[in-house]
């Protein structure tokens, strides 16, 4: 807690050698740490802070802060605490407790040049208890000299004794340097390693090496490069904030922001007996067809009624050869008492036997139209429909039995056209989904669509099998 070189540099050179007399309370404080004189120079007053080190009034963590609320120093300065880095405030508090000695008193107390040169060494001895044993070994007569001798040094006195005592000057220069860093030495010796006992037993050159080593690392107690600052940095403990920062830098902990959340929606495609086409915006109510048996409104794509499974009228295309025998078939059916409107219904098994002699080709085409029922397009405008429920059931049985056998042979008139995808192979691959299917591509192209999980190109329904 001393000002050091920076504190003394703020005082003019002429005032540094000015003799001052401390006030009684300040003098009592100085004598409590070994001072024996009544007058001092301003430089000695500024640099004599052994009281703070003796009482250990400084903060252990922030050593530049001094707490003196319950001490004599607090009564002297009138403040509970202060910082040694605030030079201006310290100088003001010190000047309040000093009285400048007049020049007449200084001349009356003037002594020889050697006394004026050696007396500061004695004063330093009194103020620096660490260097007291060294001074007793180096010069025993300096202790017996009067303590009230003048400390004024003039340029002429320095020139007269320039060649007289080179060793003393070197030692004095060394003392001035070590005295400026006395508090820094005390910090190192008292707080860190307690080296004061070993330092007292060494001679002057070894002590000078120690002081020079300290002064190399510290220029001033108040500088940023001071011993206390280096000491605090050397033994600095990382705070919690810095520790958290290092952990986050190293990536050892992940915060909630690093978590990625994905929202997944799972749709369960449950199959029903009848495919639902109500969600298709392209299909309007006008496209629905009405069953002739039960008057049920059915979607346009399924060929069978959802309620009674009756085949839709005009589902399959009408053969030209069939138009030739429409009149004769109609007359025979009317004779048998069967209701056949417009002659567009397919004949029953009895009617087929009766018309075999007149139109042999009709029976062949009827069987072909029944076999190709599963592979026809829903967009055809005309078809042949069975007239009873028994015929419908028989047709369904034949459809399941002959489905795999007639994949390539049973084509409708629309199946003669090439595949709409490759435009090269015939339409022999039926895309089946639910109870319906579409014949619009060849078998290889249909397999590719199924393998790639593509929907049906016609109705956009998921493909179940080919």
From Swiss-Prot:
A motif (Nuclear export signal) lies at residues 176-188. Residues 18-100 form the SWIB/MDM2 domain. Residues 1-101, 262-466 are annotated as: Necessary for interaction with USP2. It catalyses: S-ubiquitinyl-[E2 ubiquitin-conjugating enzyme]-L-cysteine + [acceptor protein]-L-lysine = [E2 ubiquitin-conjugating enzyme]-L-cysteine + N(6)-ubiquitinyl-[acceptor protein]-L-lysine. A zinc finger (RanBP2-type) spans 285-314. Coiled coil: none annotated. A zinc finger (RING-type) spans 419-460. Residues 209-218 are annotated as: Interaction with USP7. Belongs to the MDM2/MDM4 family. This is E3 ubiquitin-protein ligase Mdm2. It comes from Mesocricetus auratus (Golden hamster).
């Amino acid at each position: 807690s001393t000002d050091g070189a920076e504190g003394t540099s703020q005082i003019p050179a002429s005032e540094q050698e000015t003799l001052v007399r401390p006030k009684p309370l300040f003098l009592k404080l100085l004598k409590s740490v070994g001072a024996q004189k009544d007058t001092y120079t301003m430089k000695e007053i500024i640099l004599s802070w052994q009281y703070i080190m003796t009482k250990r009034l400084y903060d252990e963590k922030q050593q530049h802060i001094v707490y003196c609320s319950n001490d004599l120093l607090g009564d002297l300065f009138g403040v509970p605490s202060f910082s040694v880095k605030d030079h201006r405030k310290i100088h003001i508090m010190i000047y309040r407790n000093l009285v400048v000695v007049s020049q007449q008193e200084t001349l009356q107390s003037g002594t020889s040049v050697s006394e004026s040169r050696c007396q500061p060494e004695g004063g330093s001895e009194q103020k620096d208890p660490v260097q007291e044993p060294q001074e007793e070994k180096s010069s025993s007569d300096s202790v017996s000299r009067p303590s009230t001798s003048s400390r004024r040094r003039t340029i002429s006195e320095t020139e007269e004794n320039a060649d007289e005592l080179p060793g003393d000057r070197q030692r004095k220069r060394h003392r001035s340097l070590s005295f400026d860093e006395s508090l820094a030495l005390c910090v190192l010796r008292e707080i860190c390693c307690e080296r004061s006992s070993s330092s007292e037993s060494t001679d002057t050159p070894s002590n000078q090496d120690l002081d020079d080593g300290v002064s190399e690392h510290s220029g001033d107690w108040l500088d940023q490069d001071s011993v206390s600052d280096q000491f605090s940095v050397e033994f600095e403990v990382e705070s919690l904030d810095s520790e958290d920062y290092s952990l986050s830098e190293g990536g050892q902990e992940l915060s909630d922001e690093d978590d990625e959340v994905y929202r997944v929606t799972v749709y369960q495609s449950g199959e029903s007996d009848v495919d639902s086409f109500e969600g298709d915006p392209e299909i309007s109510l006008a496209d629905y067809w009405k069953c002739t048996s039960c008057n049920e409104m059915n979607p346009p794509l399924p060929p069978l009624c959802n309620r009674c499974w009756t085949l839709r009228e005009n589902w399959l295309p009408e053969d030209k050869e069939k138009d030739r025998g429409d009149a004769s078939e109609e007359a025979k059916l009317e004779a048998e008492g069967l209701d056949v409107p417009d002659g567009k219904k397919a004949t029953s098994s009895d009617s087929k036997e009766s018309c075999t002699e007149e139109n042999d080709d009709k029976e062949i085409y009827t069987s072909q139209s029944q076999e190709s029922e599963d592979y026809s397009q829903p967009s055809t405008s005309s078809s042949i429909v069975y007239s009873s429920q028994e015929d419908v059931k028989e047709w369904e049985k034949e459809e399941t039995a002959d489905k795999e056998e007639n994949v390539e042979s049973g084509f409708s008139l629309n199946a003669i056209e090439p595949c709409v995808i490759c435009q090269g192979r015939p339409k022999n691959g039926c895309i089946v989904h639910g109870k319906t299917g579409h014949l619009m591509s060849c078998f290889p192209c249909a397999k590719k669509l199924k393998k790639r999980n593509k929907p049906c190109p016609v109705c956009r329904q998921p493909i179940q099998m080919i």
